[in-house]
Swiss-Prot record:
Organism: Paulinella chromatophora
Signal peptide range: none
Gene: rpl24
Any GO MF annotation of the entry: rRNA binding
Known function: One of two assembly initiator proteins, it binds directly to the 5'-end of the 23S rRNA, where it nucleates assembly of the 50S subunit.
Xref: Gene3D superfamilies: 2.30.30.30
Subunit structure and binding partners: Part of the 50S ribosomal subunit.
GO biological process: translation
Annotated Gene Ontology cellular component terms: organellar chromatophore; plastid; ribonucleoprotein complex; ribosome
Protein name: Large ribosomal subunit protein uL24c
Subcellular location: Plastid, Organellar chromatophore
Superkingdom: Eukaryota
């Protein structure tokens, strides 16, 4: 029998259930509907960087070394509340629940599909 652990507030913040390497779908904002892999998380700020989502351009001035100026495009942070875990098998976004199996191991799984996340 698995026990399900609810979200717990610690130090005034909600624990993030999304980890680096997870596949997510953006559920709100200008990039709504886009799917990507989480590259980095900032749990204290409840933000994350997703590959190919929320792209920002920056104009870099030329340096004195003779390099020419250029335009750099890179991903900016997203708030964790704007994304959901995504099942690539079933093509559906879902919330994550943490369950403890009979051996005492904690595992993350998708609520809609029951798929276990690594």
């Amino acid at each position: 029998m698995a026990i399900i652990i609810p979200k717990v507030k610690t130090n005034g913040r909600i624990k993030m259930r999304i980890r680096k390497g997870d596949i997510i779908q953006v559920i709100s904002g200008k990039d709504k509907g886009k799917i990507g892999e989480v590259l980095r998380t900032l749990p204290n700020e409840n933000r994350l960087i997703v590959e190919g989502v929320n792209l920002r351009t920056r104009h870099v001035k030329p340096t004195s070394g003779g390099e020419s100026g250029r335009i750099v495009t890179k991903e900016a942070y997203l708030h964790a509340s704007n994304v959901m875990a995504y099942s690539t098998e079933n093509k559906v976004a879902s919330r994550i629940e943490i369950m403890v199996d009979s051996d005492g191991n904690r595992k993350r799984r998708l609520k809609k599909t029951g798929e276990i996340l690594a």
